[in-house]
């Protein structure tokens, strides 16, 4: 991670497309947008919301750094390292090119079929674990985390990448040019969608994302920046910054997250140029299913319950109020089977997939 990017003036100069960070903005007030003079206007139409959404994405990039250009991307050059038969699928251990000098390790589940059938596909993002992608397999070692395996059994093509620096992904944040590990993750996950769309058995218009904890918010972030993702499931993945450990956002500031939240915004939630009210709303009108347990000590459900009604106003404006779903299981930081099963049914419905 290029530490020069933590200097605010240089950072702003390197982001000519991003305006100065907003001040005094209520990030929960979703149905207003600001014109170039800073004056507020009500969001009444789809076109108005497009302006507000653009400002949300801009605010995210002020904290995360800019999304790198996706023009002239290198070939994916997928390499198969290992192959194993599973329950109706073949599981491949692969790596592929995300950008120059970087190959991303991943697991790829490909359903067995006697003839080519176009299928829906899933980006399955793992929680924090030294196992990385293997945490979401049948033998991941923790109950209620095998969603990559379970979705493959349902007939989906599934890709489960490592997030830097977990699993087999020996990534050096100090050596890259990203402002944040979060943005590197977003770029990688968009490349995973590229790979899924390159497969002959994948219907490119039927792709979803799912994750727990680290994977939960990474699924959301990927969904904001990549509208090819049609349904997003997040377990224990988010709460507004003021509700994250009572507003202590230090946990968001490591290299693999967003260092600018500390170095530029002084660990002050009021200064961070985006919040999860906006991030969730930016997924609209696509299906978003949030599992937010009552006893999750990381991501306080009280904040989630404040944010969902605000985001639903946007979903309602876009004619998809029921596409936003919240479940609050009575458990701690977990993804219980009954909620997973319900989430899978929402994925099936959103992507038109019949369970095998």
Regions found by a protein language model. Name each.
Residues 18-69, 356:
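N-terminal pre-domain segments of enzymes
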Residues 284-301, 330:
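Conserved strand-to-loop "acid loop" that flanks and positions the catalytic carboxylate
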Residues 115-201, 245-250:
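Cap/lid segment of the alpha/beta-hydrolase catalytic domain
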Residues 6-16:
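Bacterial N-terminal signal peptides
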Residues 54, 67-117:
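N-terminal cap/lid segment of alpha/beta-hydrolase-fold proteins
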Residues 309-356:
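C-terminal catalytic histidine-bearing segment of alpha/beta-hydrolase fold enzymes
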Residues 234-279, 298-308, 316-320:
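Mobile cap/lid helix-loop segments that gate and shape the active-site cleft of serine hydrolases
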Residues 191-263:
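Primarily recognizes the serine-hydrolase "nucleophile elbow" in alpha/beta-hydrolase
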């Amino acid at each position: 991670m290029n530490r020069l990017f933590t200097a605010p003036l240089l950072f702003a100069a390197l982001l000519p497309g991003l305006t100065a960070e907003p001040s005094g903005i209520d990030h929960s007030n979703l149905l207003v947008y600001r014109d170039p003079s800073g004056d507020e206007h009500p969001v009444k139409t789809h076109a108005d919301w497009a302006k507000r959404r653009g400002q949300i994405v801009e605010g995210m990039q002020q904290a995360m750094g800019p999304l790198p250009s996706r023009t002239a991307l290198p070939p994916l050059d997928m390499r198969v390292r290992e192959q194993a038969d599973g329950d109706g699928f073949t599981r491949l251990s692969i790596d592929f090119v995300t950008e120059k000098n970087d190959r991303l390790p991943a697991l790829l589940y490909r359903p067995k079929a006697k003839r080519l059938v176009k299928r829906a596909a899933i980006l399955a993002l793992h929680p924090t674990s030294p196992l990385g992608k293997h945490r979401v397999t049948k033998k991941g070692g923790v109950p209620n985390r095998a969603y990559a395996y379970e979705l493959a059994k349902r007939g989906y093509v599934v890709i489960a990448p490592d997030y830097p620096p977990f699993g087999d992904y020996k990534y050096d944040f100090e050596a890259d040019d990203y402002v944040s590990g979060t943005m590197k993750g977003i770029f990688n996950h968009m490349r995973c969608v590229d790979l899924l769309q390159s497969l002959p058995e994948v219907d490119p218009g039927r792709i979803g994302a799912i994750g727990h904890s680290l994977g939960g918010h990474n699924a959301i972030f990927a969904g904001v920046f990549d509208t090819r993702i049609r349904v997003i499931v997040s377990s224990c993945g988010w709460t507004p910054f003021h509700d994250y450990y009572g507003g202590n956002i230090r946990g968001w500031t490591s290299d693999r997250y967003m260092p600018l939240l500390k170095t530029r915004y002084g660990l002050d939630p009021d200064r961070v140029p985006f919040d999860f009210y906006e991030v969730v709303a930016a997924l609209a009108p696509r299906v978003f299913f949030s599992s937010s347990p009552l006893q999750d000590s990381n991501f306080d459900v009280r904040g989630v319950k404040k944010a969902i009604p605000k985001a639903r106003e946007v979903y309602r404006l876009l004619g998809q109020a029921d596409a936003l779903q919240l479940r609050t299981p009575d458990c701690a930081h977990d993804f219980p089977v009954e909620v997973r099963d319900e989430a899978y049914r929402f994925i099936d419905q959103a992507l038109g997939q019949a369970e095998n």
